A protein has these predicted regions:
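Eukaryotic helix-grip
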Residues: 1-351
Length: 351
């Protein structure tokens, strides 16, 4: 059984929103998404995918995906530049902490995969789907769904807006030298279009407060605003543009925060894999007969895949399953939107 700290983790079971608050949240998120979308369009159409290295310092790369951090205010001033005036760095929830210089992060480049698979891996509107996603992506420690605002539908299977709570591992946390950090935030996913018709997937995380979400004992409340855009630029190649800022609260030093933030942005490379594994699980349950017929055909090529699913007793389980290579190919090539529509309709595999 895989380690799962999501069960009974919800510290704020009383959070809900009125219809008026729901519409306000939708408007708020739409504004953030449009602001960020303009940045992506500018990066593609005006900057021609070129990063201004006077402003941005390279931190880390993974294959063709590159992570940068904005240079310190002192360095920018020496080059005659001002800090980025981005919503991510100016509209975080106030935490009454003294002003501090937080690193703005940037992720640009490409990675392998199909955008629909990626978006199926990203969208996680329920607790069970969050647990499955975390088992593949390893992007958080514990989490809870506080209140759904917009749920995926058959017409828009990748669109969601959910109020959530999560904890994440921070540097030195395992040593007990620093306290656990938690976040209350809105998470939004969906599809937009460039003026030329190109589909662009988006993923937004932005901190938010409610009267019911007061800070918890033995935890430090952090704030974050992070967005990502994904676009298919050729077969099996996804363009990525992501940026954001995380304030972990307390006194974590910049030199410790930057590597952790870089790793978090690089975890986006796991979204496609997550989507593919969810498709295989979906086909295994929905089309078992097709797999059984295929197994009757002798095939020396076999694959062993570790699949995550929710058992009848609510436990998250990872199990090694043997497939013939042809079945794996059939599953990974199936339409992720079909699986996402099933997820939107509340199919048992993705409650």
């Amino acid at each position: 059984m895989v380690k799962d700290r999501f069960i009974n983790a919800n510290p704020y079971p009383d959070v809900n929103v009125s219809e008026e608050e729901r519409l306000q949240l939708i408007d708020l998120v739409d504004g953030f998404v449009q602001d960020y979308f303009q940045k992506y369009e500018k990066f593609v159409l005006v900057d021609k995918h070129q990063v201004d290295e006077r402003r941005w310092e390279h931190v880390k790369s993974k294959d063709n995906l590159h992570i940068y951090t904005e240079r310190s205010q002192k360095e920018l001033a020496s080059k005659g530049l001002q800090p980025e005036n981005a919503p991510s760095s100016t509209e975080l929830v106030d935490d009454d902490s003294p002003e501090k210089e937080l690193p703005v992060m940037l992720s640009v480049g490409t990675f392998v995969g199909e955008m629909d698979d990626l978006m199926f891996g990203v969208v996680n509107p329920t607790l069970d789907v969050m647990r499955i996603k975390a088992s593949y992506v390893h992007d958080l420690d514990s989490a809870a769904v506080l209140c759904p605002v917009v749920e995926p539908s058959e017409e828009e299977p990748f669109r969601s807006l959910v109020v959530k709570w999560m904890t994440i591992d921070v540097p030195l946390q395992s040593t007990n030298l620093v306290k656990c950090r938690d976040f209350v935030y809105i998470e939004a996913t969906g599809i937009l279009h460039f003026t030329n018709g190109d589909r662009v997937g988006y993923h937004l995380l932005h901190s938010i407060n409610f009267p019911q979400t007061k800070p918890l004992p033995n935890r430090i409340r952090g704030n974050l605003s992070v967005f990502g855009f994904f676009r298919q630029i050729e077969e099996n190649v996804i363009d990525n543009f992501a940026s954001g800022i995380v304030d972990p609260g307390g006194d974590i030093m910049r030199f410790l925060l930057i590597p952790a933030a870089a790793e978090a942005l690089l975890s986006a490379t796991n979204y496609v894999y997550c989507g593919q594994m969810k498709k295989i699980s979906w086909m295994l349950q929905r089309r078992r007969s097709a797999f059984e017929r295929q197994e009757q055909v002798k095939n020396s090529d076999e694959c062993i895949i570790r699949i995550s699913f929710i058992a009848l007793d609510g436990q998250l389980i990872q199990r090694k399953v043997t497939f013939c290579a042809k079945c794996v190919g059939m599953a990974t090539k199936c339409d992720a939107q079909d699986a996402a529509r099933d997820q939107a309709e509340g199919y048992a595999a993705y409650k």
